């Protein structure tokens, strides 16, 4: 036998190579182009290797997708999710009503809390359940929650179930009604053939025919109809709500030959609305009293009824407000944030014989006026401050009380009875109230203008106790290093519900220069200095005020004064995360401080040292942690 040829030997080697590598994920190749599209080619010197990519299996020359979902332990989908195989990988899919959360698997989606996910009716309440949600119609309404409407008799006092679009809703018929303005409904109009077969629902009569139904039997062949319909009963007063009456039709000598049930309500504007139904026969139509055309009592207040006198309608005080004893005169007191308002009811004053009302406070320059917001009252207003209008301030440890006296007369001169009404408003002491009632608090203030939301004022003050209700007063404070400083910042004006006051950097310097390179940070980058155990941040970025405390200290070296500075920021709670997240022992370098947003307070002098306030130079040296003295400061910021 001769020697095997080189070609035959090469074929054997190649075949052996394929057999050896077929069972592995890696194969040697001559060129990278021989590798499968889902393989990675590696060239190492003279060897070219094909390796299947992650998620695929094969020898590199041929790679097929690995189904991780079918192999135990090959995927990390949670038990409540489904594994879906994808080319080279897999994905975990949650069932409807759930969302994939890292580390938690599939968690329930609260469709009620996220806009656009629930499709409940506007009146319905969304109730979240695991994997879905429910829609519940309110009490008195019927429906499946995706559609809700009221049912007759289910609405509250003074309300009725009325059409609104394609649904029925509970509403006040004084606002939800249609109008009838036909002049021929007047009882003075002659015969005709009108028939109210199409009337159903709440209506108000307006126009030249009259504003209310006739209350007496109407002669036949009037109101442009054959058998006129009139209201068999009196109209209700506004405090009676919705009442039921009978409308009678006059024909053939009978004032009530036919009848229909109607409902009537007296409205605050001095008019009436009627829930009418189609009459039982034709030709029948509802008639109006022509005397109600003029003087329709549109100006009647809620304390008055619309009454007819000699064919003319006018406003008349309700019987409930008639009093004969001055001691029964009621007054309404409103204690506002900045002023106090005391009011007396006009109807009660009229019943006591006050045709004219002269009312004033201890300072007679503060006199009464007709309340524009409520025609039933005459009012007088005084600022909630000590002094204006004769207002007197008294305070204790918990409250500040402003008091004054209201004087009442029916003439500009008084000979006999001098009527006095003492009134007072008490306000719980907080940072704002305590500063307002202090004679000369140490305060720093800053004005801030935020585009579209108005002007804000930020104040900073130093308080004596952890209640933050006793501010230090005067231009400077002297304290020992054993004392604690209680520092409060507060925001006034503008939309306080939207913005939170955030103290970004609060620090002390030995001089009045806020840019002094020697700084001791109490709050830095929104977080307290954790190396000082005496620092306590009570509130920051949570509301319209901020509070922190620290033990008094002094700077090492020849420094006896401490000045406090706070950089503040108005945080938009609708678009920003305002409350700082602070944890661990960190003390960062911080960002550049915006001096236009810095409140400055001081000096605070170490007890036993005579203060020299005129020093304003920058100071270099070491800080010895004793603890800082603080005064109140006020700052004004402008944001464009």
Curated annotation (Swiss-Prot):
Keyword Disulfide bond listed: yes
Stretches the record annotates as External hydrophobic patch (EHP): 598-606
One record GO biological process: urea transmembrane transport
Substitution effect: residue 430 to L: Impairs polymerization and filament formation of the secreted form
Topological category with respect to the lipid bilayer: Lipid-anchor; GPI-anchor
Main location: membrane
Effect of residue 236 to R: In ADTKD1; results in defective trafficking of mutant protein to the plasma membrane; the mutant is retained in the ER
Record-annotated site: Cleavage: 587-588
Name of this protein: Uromodulin
């Amino acid at each position: 036998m001769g020697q095997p040829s080189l070609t035959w030997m090469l074929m054997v080697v190649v075949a052996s190579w394929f057999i050896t590598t077929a069972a592995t994920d890696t194969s040697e190749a001559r060129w990278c182009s021989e590798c499968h599209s889902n393989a990675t080619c590696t060239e190492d010197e003279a060897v070219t290797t094909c390796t299947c990519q992650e998620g695929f299996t094969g020898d590199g020359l041929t790679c097929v997708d690995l189904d991780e979902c079918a192999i135990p332990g090959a995927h990390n989908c949670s038990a409540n999710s489904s594994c879906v195989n994808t080319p080279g990988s897999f994905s975990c899919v949650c069932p409807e009503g759930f969302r994939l959360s890292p580390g938690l698997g599939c968690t329930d989606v609260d469709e009620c809390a996220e806009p656009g996910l629930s499709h409940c009716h506007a009146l319905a309440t969304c109730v979240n359940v695991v994997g879905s949600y429910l829609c519940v119609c309110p009490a008195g309404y019927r429906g499946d929650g995706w559609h809700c409407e009221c049912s007759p008799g289910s609405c509250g006092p003074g309300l009725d179930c009325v059409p609104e679009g394609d649904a029925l809703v509970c509403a006040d018929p004084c606002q939800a009604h249609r109008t009838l303005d036909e002049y021929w409904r007047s009882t003075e109009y002659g015969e005709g053939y009108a028939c109210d077969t199409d009337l159903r629902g709440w209506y108000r009569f307006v126009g030249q025919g009259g504003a209310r139904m006739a209350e007496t039997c109407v002669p036949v062949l009037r109101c442009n109809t054959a058998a006129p319909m009139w209201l068999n009963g009196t109209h209700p007063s506004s405090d009676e709500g919705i009442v039921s009456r009978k409308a009678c039709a006059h024909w053939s000598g009978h004032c009530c030959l036919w009848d229909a049930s109607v409902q009537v309500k007296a409205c605050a504007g001095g008019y009436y609305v009627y829930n009418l139904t189609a009459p039982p026969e034709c030709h029948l139509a509802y008639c109006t009293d022509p005397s109600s055309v003029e003087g329709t009592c549109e100006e009647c207040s809620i304390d008055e009824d619309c009454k007819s006198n000699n064919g003319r309608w006018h406003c008349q005080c309700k019987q409930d407000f008639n009093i004969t004893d001055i001691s029964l005169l009621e007054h309404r007191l409103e204690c506002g944030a900045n002023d106090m308002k005391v009011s007396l009811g006009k109807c009660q004053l009229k019943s006591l014989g006050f045709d004219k009302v002269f009312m004033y406070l201890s300072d007679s320059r503060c006199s009464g006026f007709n309340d524009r917001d409520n025609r039933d009252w005459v009012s007088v207003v005084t600022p909630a401050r000590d002094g204006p209008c004769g207002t007197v301030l008294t305070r204790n440890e918990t409250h500040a009380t402003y008091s004054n006296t209201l004087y009442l007369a029916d003439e500009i001169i008084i000979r006999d009875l001098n009527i006095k009404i003492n009134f007072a408003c008490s306000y719980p002491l907080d940072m704002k109230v305590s500063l307002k009632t202090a004679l000369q608090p140490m305060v720093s203030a800053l004005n801030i203008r935020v585009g579209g939301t108005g002007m804000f004022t930020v104040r900073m003050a130093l308080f004596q106790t952890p209640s933050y209700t006793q501010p230090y007063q005067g231009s400077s404070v002297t304290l020992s290093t054993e004392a604690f400083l209680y520092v409060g910042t507060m925001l006034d004006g503008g939309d306080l519900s939207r913005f939170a006051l955030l103290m970004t950097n609060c620090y002390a310097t030995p001089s009045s220069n806020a840019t002094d390179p020697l700084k001791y940070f109490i709050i830095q980058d929104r977080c307290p200095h954790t190396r000082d155990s005496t620092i306590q941040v009570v509130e920051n970025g949570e509301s319209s005020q901020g509070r922190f405390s620290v033990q008094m200290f002094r700077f090492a070296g020849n420094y006896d004064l401490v000045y406090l500075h706070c950089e503040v920021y108005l945080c938009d709670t609708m678009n920003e995360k305002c409350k700082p997240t602070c944890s661990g022992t960190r003390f960062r370098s911080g960002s550049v401080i915006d001096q236009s947003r810095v409140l400055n307070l001081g000096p605070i002098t170490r007890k036993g040292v005579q203060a020299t306030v005129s020093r304003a130079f920058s100071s270099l040296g070491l800080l010895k942690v004793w603890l800082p003295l603080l005064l109140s400061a006020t700052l004004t910021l402008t944001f464009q």
